[in-house]
């Protein structure tokens, strides 16, 4: 499972796109990677996609002796890249892939309604409509407000939404830096933390050191 996020250096106006965080199917961190070439645009260029995926696939093969058969890509926000590139790239390796957008900022609120009684939704509750969904990953006491659900959208792939939501929920519960839920899955959550330490992340090198937690 791979996530990347675009990090911005506010002082220099530079974006560091595709800072990737790579996990195996058990939720174990394999590594993270910051590309060498920064960019100023919103769309991640094909050359950077190539750099990122070449490195993460090579690292997976070195660790497990084979390439993954399936990859789930979590995007923080919108995915605007060319799907044809993904199809051609992963097609060469016979790898199935899914692209999932995870949006943490949404005005939607969920509630649990039983007759005339309205309560906060329980952690793990969700609403699905086609390839879009909202899921609650945290508990909040009734007198402290209401939880903020994550907005989930599948933009490519064959995974069903229930499997996607189960994966995202599970990944939000296994943050090693705390006994509490992280709200975000560790894919996007760790990438957020990497962005806050982006100037200390070496370019062009794979690492599994979680100093940014």
For each predicted feature, which ranges?
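Long, contiguous domain-sized segments
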Residues: 1-213
